Amino acid sequence: MKTAGLLLLVTGIISLSGCALFKRARVHEHNAIESREFNLPIFLYPAKKPQTRKLLIFLSGDGGWIKFEDDLSVKFAENNFFTIGINSRDYFWDQKTPEQTAHDLVQLIRKYALRYKTDQVYLLGYSFGADVLPFIYNQLPLRAKRHVMALEMLSPFSTTDFMVHFGDLANISSDNYPYKVDLEVKKLKIPVFCFYGLDENEKALETIVQKNFVIGSLYGDHHYKDSEYDKIISVLKQKP
């Protein structure tokens, strides 16, 4: 009976794999300028006021570049952040390493910091994008780190693997990957703002206690209410 049930589950998943949910290129309608640079699938949102000094790099969840990422990026741009989104689903569809990702990202930062004449960089990640964020920052060269003002992690899990897994997309995998997010966060010295939805079942990093780590809550579950976007933005607007 168990074998038959497992076979039915596998058959169902295989049949679902043909739908958009399980395809690499998952991008919804958006308001960005879409491009690919330094191996990174990016989405550009110019700041409302060009004279701003703030540059935001936003790593999406493994669901792709969809409505949440687009809506939040638009709001950041309206609040005078030059915003560059990265489609984590596309980029991490193939296995990466923290070193490789940091190498690609620092080239992107250098190019757009020069183009936009910004010297204040902020790193934001949602879900899978939040999981990999501390590893990437810790691999940046010292010169690049000096310009990163803060990290913001939205609904991170406890482990990650620098690759999108089918089981995660199907919501059938366990949070047991080789890269331990909490241990990497503890190495960080710059301000880190972490948020979870009030109704999320697991808040993997809620037990971390260190001076530079601030944890907060947002209305909603793993998908927040639209009214909470201002709260996400406000913590970075205050730094420095």
Where are these regions (language model features)?
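C-terminal catalytic histidine-bearing segment of alpha/beta-hydrolase fold enzymes
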Residues: 214-240
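Short, surface-exposed "cap/lid" segments of acyl-processing enzymes
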Residues: 34-81, 85-88
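Gly/Ala-rich beta-loop-alpha elbow adjacent to hydrolase catalytic centers
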Residues: 124-133
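The feature captures the conserved acid-bearing segment of alpha/beta-hydrolase catalytic domains
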Residues: 163-211
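Conserved acidic catalytic loop of the alpha/beta-hydrolase fold
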Residues: 104-119
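Active-site nucleophile loop of the alpha/beta-hydrolase fold
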Residues: 151-164
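C-terminal motif of bacterial Sec signal peptides marking the signal peptidase cleavage site
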Residues: 17-18
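Conserved hydrolase catalytic core segment
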Residues: 136-148
